Amino acid sequence: MLRSEKPVAVEDIVNIYKESPSVIITHYHGLTVSQVSSLRDSLKSKEAGFKVVKNTLAKIAANQTGLDSIANLFAGPTAIVYSKEPVEMAKLVVNFAKANDNLKIIGGIVDNHVLDEHSIKELSKLPSLNELRGKIVGLLQAPATKVVGVLQAPSSSMARVIQAHASKN
């Protein structure tokens, strides 16, 4: 990389750190081009990205954005995975790492909190934001449907009693 290209590359990484509240740092040594392409495609469908970074430039970008605590994670063949939705991204990366031993999760950041590999795996087990919204809506609707059922029950049971009494006579 030319010296004149380095500030532009650092600025790209700084923008990723600023615009994405969640970043996972990985080692990708041994992944084939087709495996990386497959990972990128699956991430793209979830509005996430995968970027191979130079460690020194990633450290500089981390220092410029106040993320000094992750600078020590950049060693070896490093790539960052970034997204605005941490749970979906973590699920994709963890599942891909299970299927491909050459992708190693090193750590990451979610909302300025540094996570280790274990924490990212635990994050991937959580329901996504959309799943949580669906559960909340379901919980809010459940009492209303129960109230309607309770209100309708006396009138329907009263109608059955009258019908039974009428059929006897």
Curated annotation (Swiss-Prot):
Determine if Nuclease is one of this entry's keywords: no
Matching entries from SUPFAM superfamilies are given as: Ribosomal protein L10-like
What GO biological process terms are annotated to this protein in UniProt? translation
Gene Ontology CC annotations of this record? large ribosomal subunit
User: What does the record give under GO molecular function?
Assistant: large ribosomal subunit rRNA binding; structural constituent of ribosome
* Pfam families for this protein: Ribosomal_L10 (PF00466)
CDD domains from the UniProt entry: Ribosomal_L10
User: What PROSITE patterns does UniProt report for this protein, alphabetically?
Assistant: RIBOSOMAL_L10
Keyword line: Ribonucleoprotein, Ribosomal protein, RNA-binding, rRNA-binding
General function of this protein: Forms part of the ribosomal stalk, playing a central role in the interaction of the ribosome with GTP-bound translation factors.
Family stated for the protein in its record: Belongs to the universal ribosomal protein uL10 family.
How does the record describe its quaternary structure?
Part of the ribosomal stalk of the 50S ribosomal subunit. The N-terminus interacts with L11 and the large rRNA to form the base of the stalk. The C-terminus forms an elongated spine to which L12 dimers bind in a sequential fashion forming a multimeric L10(L12)X complex.
Q: What is this protein called?
A: Large ribosomal subunit protein uL10
The encoding gene: rplJ
